[in-house]
């Protein structure tokens, strides 16, 4: 028996030894050529499995080599790699983390069942982002062992995951037997019904109560509880009735449905009168003299303790200094605290006061902000890093915020919104209104959330979440395919090619990606609608994108609270996004949830045109006539017919015929489940017609995009009054393609009616 050693040389620095054993050499085999069973490597020559031991427990940085300062690979986030077995239903997304570091930076390879992973080895391909291997919509063929191998010249380590894909069974939801249970309660008690739902597909759960109809044998039902944006399945499995009365007695039903079918189970609630108290109960309820003394002493101690806490907080907040007083401000940069606006709508009720606030600042103005301990942050905990955006009156900075988690300090990245030195009284009030809106609305995954405010010892700061990928419009343009007609016209849209950022993940957008973007924005808008908030400035430029591609609705500078009524009428001449506005908003200055739905339709068009400019070639003074004639935006290149029908529904002239945001969320949820992960191939087709415009339109688009980049502070500035009743849709104004166009005032209604009559006669 003879042994032959075959040496395979690495393109870098690794030598791999393989042994070939031949038991008996025959004469006929003397000229046979032997070769290594290792396939020809397509990457640096460590496509084989490592032979140095798995070293899976290397969790800290090993010692450096004294001569070269190098380090062998080591795990940096071992705690996030502890789960080895992943059992997932078919269709789910699976992520395998391989967080590793070393000096030099180790190269990472992935193996499936001892074979190297190539990007297109599976349907939908593999994705690798931030040291994570991603398998979207897994199927049964994805089962197996996945091993991450990290190697540099000082050594190698590896880590193995096991994936088990389970076949989905198509069935309607299953409700746990015996739930909900029948209940009996006295008047004034609280009652809780529970219902356990099992469903492979995402279930939609509702709680119903039957209403006896004496005129009809079949009972009617009223919906007591339905799933919202922030509710989870666990929340929906519980129904709580507070302070029950006789009228609430009856049958309660837990209803669960999915795409396969519907299941339901019911329980009865009996409400009983409160029994009269017995003699023993009355005797026990009479406190004796000792108990009275104890109660009084406890009350005094509680009051003293509360006073001590207030004094400590008072001293801590002002550091021993006098509290802020109402002062006159000669320099706007030194604005002291200002009064919290409890009712923002009051700002628009007094016309004279509003006109006074809109005038340029000629005299010092006064503010007093009350301290809100729930939201107040210390300025010394915030470090401004770099300017992200700047408008005429405001600016946004990227910053580091130090927070205290128990006894440990942590640093997080945030954004800080503030005014510039040339602000006036109205600008400060606008920023205060935005702050109050964000406080009132609360937190949601798909809106930019308020982290805190700085109102003491300096100018007003709003500290908000940071979105690493910028706004959705710029993200879509950065991710347009390279070397297509779509990208060749970008410079004419007002963008500098030298400023283009690289594609963040190097992956071409798929249909599922852009449908997901639309679905996430719709969820955020549904949440705002539930909070009685109309945004008034929905556009791709006002949707921010995080590092994890989470869509977040931003820029509440134009948002308004409509809790007191269902609409908001604008009386001032502030700039508004004309090409995104509904017909009734253009003509009557009335904004409702239905006008936000229209704007969302234009935003959908932006998404599925990869950030195209709406209504190319149409001047602002021609837009009303264009829309009144029944014309709408054409179907964007990358939208399906069903998606375009959804856009057209949003653009119904009659606001009552437009869908609400809950319906939009449900439709987009279904489209997302049916969408494909196939990558778009023919991006060049149709781009020339969609993005190329005449030279005049290109100039208009350039001006529009430059204005789009400004923040809300510039958009809300006041413009000069109309001269002699001239309508703003004149030829001189048409040369300015500013997407924020001043609305018409009520005193121009006669001129507007004449203009509408002229447009109808021309049509």
Curated annotation (Swiss-Prot):
Sites bearing Phosphotyrosine, chain numbering: 568
Cited CDD domains: PTKc_FGFR (cd05053)
Cysteines joined through disulfide linkages: 98-148, 195-254
Cellular compartments per GO CC: plasma membrane; receptor complex
Domain Protein kinase: 382-672
Acidic residues biased stretches: 691-711
Cytoplasmic side: 313-763
Task performed by this protein: Receptor for basic fibroblast growth factor.
Similarity comment: Belongs to the protein kinase superfamily. Tyr protein kinase family. Fibroblast growth factor receptor subfamily.
Protein name: Fibroblast growth factor receptor
Organism ancestry: Eukaryota, Metazoa, Chordata, Tunicata, Ascidiacea
Gene: FGFR
